[in-house]
């Protein structure tokens, strides 16, 4: 795919079937002329970035297509200190996510006694005075060695009611071998709230997951706490020189995967099937495109590609040849199955630049699908997003929140010779995309 770049400020893509050429125009900040401060496109959409910290090359304020703002705070080392989204900026909340870095470790005669850590705070709109906190500890190699998270554990003793307890959930300890590989991994433990920044040295009482490696750092055997074992063997196929990886799970099921020197899978074998070995082989062309798949019964599926690396034909044994045509932009224009070819018909696709707007079927045009998108003056945060979809069953309209989440859908179903039924469903999310509320409105008939 070719594109035009004009003085580094405008990129124009190839034309689609309508002759439309998508373009993006870039405007740079006036001080250093290095960082993009505004992007416009052929749809009329625009996004902006501003308040640059040139020392670190980062923008502290960004505006999306729906003209909603996002802010970032940095510390003196260029690390992100706090992030605010549209919800927080509208309500005056200081952050949705904040970070506190404490990278300095405490050393004793036997090494690190207190590792460095960082605290991540997630603002919780349901509990404004109680952030959800995550503490990550790292060792001298920069490896995360422990993670603590806020949590609630429900316990119940026989004969008593369940009890909720607020705790810190501590990730399981890892034991490393001399080569820095995880040899033992323990289950998580819990601790009382109040010592979140203190490394927890406790090991869970349950046996750990034990991993044994070969000299090439490949896992050879993994033993779970219940003594279930997964074994992996590595060998070379004598005929093709492919790497053969044979995995045996705890139930004795065995599967072999053959990969070539480029890491592509050329053959898989189910070695423990009830009807014998089940083999699937794969063939590629000179530029690593999958062109042939042969199953264990000798059935062959082939694929053909054009010079633009687009698949133009797929021929599975069950359904026959399916062909595709494309425009210069790479949009699929037509699809023709073996049955449609007999009648000289195709499924046709329409686009607005690179955006799908319609699917037209050769038979039963009432099943055609249309897509409508929000323009530059759309409301409900629908600029640049799918606004309405129409198909044979009716239509569905979308309403969005400030973070791009779907807040409401209006589903209209057309029942032939009966009535038009409308269903309205609404959702409410916080800034972490957690569902807080769902409202379902009963059907309304017209």
Predicted regions and their residues:
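Acidic, low-complexity segments
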Residues: 1-446
